[in-house]
Amino acid sequence: YRHKGLRETSVNTIMGEIKYKRVMYEVKEEGITKTVYLLDETLKISEEGKASSNLVEKVIETVPVTDSYRKAEEVIDTTTNTSLSHEKIRKIIVKIGDKITNKEKEERKLFDKNQLVAGLKEVTALFEEADGIWINLQGKDRKERLEKNKQKAERENKEFNPKMKIKTELKLHVMYEGWKKEDSRHSLVNKQYIAGIMKPKEIARLRDARVFSQYDESKIKLRATNGDGAKWTKGITAKGGIYQKDQFHIMQEIVRDVPIEYRNIFIELINKKEFEKIQPAIDGLKYELNGEYQAVKKLNKLE
């Protein structure tokens, strides 16, 4: 390292902006000369937006519970002694997201190459939940998808609507070891999340990598996945595991797909846990409705 003198900078913290001087060093690595600020690295000052780690944490906590980056800007401004523009907030989130994405890619890569060290933690069961949220694409992503849709419409000689809404599914996955009682509530034990606009196989491989690197898989006797019935949530079920539709989505489909005068039949069977009677009830209702196509099609979702 070569000492190249002091350089002044500033950093945003939750207590306000702080100005300071730190040494700039010049270092040569593999024939390439670059400058580094060791104090910045020690203090974990992010390069993008010059924000302290505690302010970055505040941004990460704020953005998911606000409607937009502009709203997050307002919240940061009123709950801390500093201010960040909505563009700086966006850059911080993008940078953190890129780091997480790269880390997850590396986990999958090491798992595929059998280079992960097997875990030793012993548990008898692992539980998983999978669901999706459809969101509107914006900016560059929307333009790219619109262009693809336009080309497809031209190939198929169909009409193209440039103002159409472009949606994609944000997939969510959580894995945990069980529940523990805390006062009147139950909290999940060692919950771990995966979230992103990802392919199902990417979620499954990342999940498998984490299970392999944390647990002694020979000791796990039960793998159970709860989902909304979507094809991808069933497809990521662990080998030898069981898949079940969670009660919220079962009730949702009963309300949506079963004629109102018959709903209580199914709700009562579920509440009494008389699950073996549900399929005969579905078959009986199909007969009662005289096999009407649309009604039967909806009832098939309950099977």
Labelled PLM ranges:
Residues 1, 6-9, 13-44:
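Cys/His-rich short segments
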